[in-house]
Structures are given as C-alpha cells and as structure tokens.
Amino acid sequence: QTILEEMFIPFVIGRSPHDAERIYEDLYDSQRVRGYFGGFALDAIAGLDMALWDLRGKLLGQPVWQLLGGKRHDRIPAYVSGLPGKTVAERAALAKEWMDRGFSALKFAGAVADAGELVEMAAIREAIGPGPKILVDLHWHYTALEAIRLIDQLCAYDLYLAEAPVAPEDID
C-alpha cells in the first residue's frame, strides 16, 4: 500500500482510465533512476495497470479482452505450475496425474528439487513420458556459466523452457 500511495498514486489521480497505456509508460519511466527490471515497485505498477484496464472496461461496459484488440485464438495453451509434493516421487506422480487430466505441459520449481534439478527432471520425464513439455523455474539461483551447464544437462530430458536461471541484473 505504501509503494502505491507514496510513489505511484500521484501519477494516476485526475487522469482518465482511458489513458491506461500512457499512465503505464509514465509509471514505468518513473522507475528508471531506481532500476526498473523487477521488484516490488514493478509489481505495484502491474497491479495499477490491471486495475486501470478493469476500470476502463467497466466504464465502457466491455470485457478487457475486447479493449485489448479482441479474440485472437480459439484456445490458449496453459501449463500446470508447481508440484507441491514432499518428495521427488510424489511430485513425479502428481505430474503424471496432471497429464492424465489433459494438460500437455508443466513447470516445476528448481528451488524445491531437494535431490537437484536433474534428478527431478528425470523423475518427471519418466513419469509423464516423452510428449508433454517440461518447464523449470530456476529462481535466479545460478551464474550464467552454471545456468548454461545445467540447462545443457536438462535438455537431455527434453527441457522446453528454463525460467529465471540468472538474476535479471546479471548482464554478463
């Protein structure tokens, strides 16, 4: 609440929600001197942006998807995010359950892979078979070189995507 009140509400008060794009740009630009790649400030900006689009839709009597240009796809791919089992075996079994329910992709958190990401990836791939996509969130845990080495090893299990392998500020 403090971030919103002290940093961003002054940019919004008195402005039209129909100007959501410009307001977002102003809010985002206001963070350039503080670093604008992540953190609570950008979370607050995202929340304000969504609220403005929602308000705009309510004022116009239209759903936000229409305001954003209308329907573009009949279906949108989705994946399961998170496997809250206590052990590798439980998480692999849960992955299989989700695939059996009709999902074709899942993401697991490398941070909770207590036996390591490779063991987790191998167990999940064995449980779900060769078709479904597997994504892993590495939670900014690695240096660039460590991430490259790990991702190369994960690719042996047909890794689809590695999310956040290095800190966003790590430009080396």
Regions found by a protein language model. Name each.
Residues 38, 74-90, 109-110, 137-144:
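Active-site mouth loops of central-metabolism enzymes
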Residues 72-78, 102-104, 130-132, 158-160:
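Short, well-ordered coil/turn segments that N-cap beta-strands
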Residues 108-172:
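Catalytic core of soluble alpha/beta enzymes
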Residues 53-86:
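Catalytic pocket of metal/acid-base enzymes, prominently hydrolases
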